[in-house]
Amino acid sequence: MKIIFAGTPEFAATALAALLKTSHEIIAVYTQPDRKAGRGQKLTPSPVKQLVLEYNIPVYQPLHFKASTEEGLAAQQELAALGADVMVVAAYGLILPQAVLDTPKYGCLNIHGSLLPRWRGAAPIQRAIATGDDETGITIMQMAAGLDTGDMMYKTYCPITSEDTSATLHDKLAAQGATAICAVLESEETLQKYLAEREVQDESLTVYAHKLVKSEARIDWSMNAVQVDRNIRAFNPWPVAFIQLDENNALRVWYSTISNQNKADAKAGEIIAIDKQGVHVACGENTFICLTSVQWPGGKALNAQQIAQTQKLHVGQILP
């Protein structure tokens, strides 16, 4: 089949890499425009574009597909002229109007990082961890105009462990997504079968995974330790959980575990011990967490042993 692929970050690049190994013809790749990145603020292509530059495949980077503008209408016409059988979309980042969704012979298929209709939206991996879900997965759906509202065609399941961060879970789901889309597109007959058997989402089960904002990564010591630990894992690698030491300085917290220490009358945010395991801090409901990797401004991430050696934190200190 002739496939258009649309995606931007590593999650999408993993799926594209798998599709490139199949007998299908990737006739075009759509990705977000190059963005400034890094300390030098150099224009940097997306992971999807970086991958596809090794192949002789045309890359398109429209700003949008809005038919109300000349450039948007031109982008729609350009895509239609490609004559694709199907378009695969994974974390593309642009809204696709119905005219685009209807263009390929079999429409547009989306690789979504949750078990829909739970966690529609921008941050399904992070929200699943922060909420304490014990399972997530991949849904392949036929796209509709609404946000992740399309009919479901295929699902895979992935347990969420107590050690999973958004980084580790992302990589597991990226691999599952790649396998899933290749299974759905094994042949034209297979695709027709999954399209015929597709399932409408139950709107009553919908939960939205709202976009992350940096401010919510600030640690709230009044929460119990289990919730603090979930948030630390959910916000790794971005925006990274932090302790606001003062107006200008934040201590980033990369990793934690539930503490085996306790203190009867500890205040929320109080450091009750510092040892080879890490920094033990009191949380809400008389629970305790152990911070095992932290990073001071301008420094690198430190492990438990290095934290103790800095002597920047002390027992009895109340963290804000």
From Swiss-Prot:
It catalyses: L-methionyl-tRNA(fMet) + (6R)-10-formyltetrahydrofolate = N-formyl-L-methionyl-tRNA(fMet) + (6S)-5,6,7,8-tetrahydrofolate + H(+). It comes from Acinetobacter baumannii (strain SDF). Keywords: Protein biosynthesis, Transferase. PANTHER family: METHIONYL-TRNA FORMYLTRANSFERASE, METHIONYL-TRNA FORMYLTRANSFERASE, MITOCHONDRIAL. One of its GO terms (molecular function) is methionyl-tRNA formyltransferase activity. Pfam families: Formyl_trans_C (PF02911), Formyl_trans_N (PF00551). HAMAP family: Formyl_trans (MF_00182). One of its GO terms (cellular component) is cytosol. Disulfide bonds: none annotated. NCBIfam families: fmt. This is Methionyl-tRNA formyltransferase. The gene is fmt. It comes from the Bacteria. InterPro entries: Fmt, Formyl_trans_C, Formyl_trans_C_sf, Formyl_transf_N, Formyl_transf_N_sf, Formyl_transferase-like_C_sf, Met-tRNA-FMT_C, Met-tRNA-FMT_N. Attaches a formyl group to the free amino group of methionyl-tRNA(fMet). The formyl group appears to play a dual role in the initiator identity of N-formylmethionyl-tRNA by promoting its recognition by IF2 and preventing the misappropriation of this tRNA by the elongation apparatus. It is an enzyme of class 2 (transferase). Belongs to the Fmt family. Its EC number is 2.1.2.9. (6S)-5,6,7,8-tetrahydrofolate binds at residues 114-117.
